[in-house]
């Protein structure tokens, strides 16, 4: 399980180095094989270990290509999906189109989300966190059924 936010740098070839604390688990769980795609709601990327991505693909195959909304989701997620494999130094190459979608330049944030990572431009990440905190402080939100019973 992935948790926490880590500041990383992209090298000149568009590679990011996976933090050491995740490398061993990724090597064991998926032999360093991952899939990266766009987040369709946020300016970030979603980086999945291959077994987790295969679960997403199974769900996507059950969608109808005749339904415009379902076809759109398939097109966006699968059309941007890119296989990535950690090299011996724990680095992953992010394709130029993926980097462009998330506005990735030199500094980025790798954010653990239990079964996947989000990859953000560092400034965009800090802006998003500030916005999320403002919404929580203002109390201007509606709890859905799953959040009503959630407690920290």
UniProtKB/Swiss-Prot annotation:
Chief subcellular site?
A: cytoplasm
Q: Taxonomically, which superkingdom?
A: Bacteria
Q: Give compartment(s).
A: Cytoplasm, Nucleoid
**Record flagged with keyword Transcription regulation:** yes
InterPro entries recorded: MraZ, MraZ_C, MraZ_dom, MraZ_N, MraZ_sf, SpoVT-AbrB_dom, SpoVT-AbrB_sf
SUPFAM superfamilies from the entry? Answer: AbrB/MazE/MraZ-like
Would you kindly state one Gene Ontology biological process term found in this protein's UniProt entry?
negative regulation of DNA-templated transcription initiation
Q: How does it assemble?
A: Forms oligomers.
Q: Enumerate the transmembrane spans.
A: none
Q: Give the matching HAMAP family.
A: MraZ
Query: What is the name of the protein in this document?
Result: Transcriptional regulator MraZ
What positions does the domain SpoVT-AbrB occupy?
Answer: 5-52, 81-124
Keywords from the named record: Cytoplasm, DNA-binding, Repeat, Transcription, Transcription regulation
Q: Name one GO cellular component term.
A: nucleoid
Protein family per UniProt: Belongs to the MraZ family.
Query: Which Gene Ontology molecular-function terms are recorded?
Result: DNA-binding transcription factor activity; transcription cis-regulatory region binding
Q: Give one Pfam family.
A: MraZ
